[in-house]
Amino acid sequence: VLFRSEGELTAVYSVGDTQYGKDDTPAIIQRMLNAIDDSVAHHIFLSSKYKIGQIALPQLGDCIEGMTSQKGKVMGRHDIGVSEQTRVGRRVLLAQIKAMAQLASKVIVPVVPGNHDEVQRFLVQHANDSWALEVAAAVADICVENEFLKDRVEFRFPATDDLTLAVDLSGTLYGMAHGHQSSNLIKWWT
């Protein structure tokens, strides 16, 4: 364990639009690993000043490039296939969780789907038929089997057909939605 603080506050480290598989996956992975290292360092700094007992790692959609956007034309720029994109997504999310779980007594991983994560678009489907949710669900299964993580990490998913999620983080309601849902945010929020 690097450093674990106890307290009432929640630190939030959000991730979205990684789009593994888009053009240069090795560079995207490296940026994410660097961001994880930076988050650990920043959290240690914050914990020296504030009583942070919980960490939230919101996953805000588009973890993979997928094959549905632009009527499938995005596949022409893939450097890895969809199954490998989800594999990368699982491995990076697990790395993030393992790094941050050493720093707090509780880690919450709320997840919402994005548009690139859609499994398909040619039939009407449930909104939660999403590669982003599948990546997180697979990592949740791994965490349940891990002695260190099983009681420390909690995943939160939207209800069937919901694209949004709200979670209570230390008394603050934290709402999440992927940005593809609105072209006019002011109108969308009202």
Could you describe each region identified by the protein language model?
Residues 6-11, 15, 29-142:
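Core catalytic region of metal-dependent phosphoesterases/phosphodiesterases
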Residues 98-110, 119-123, 129-190:
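His/acidic metal-ligating clusters that form di-metal
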Residues 18-25:
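Short acidic, Gly/Ser-rich segments with clustered Asp/Glu that frequently serve as metal-coordination loops
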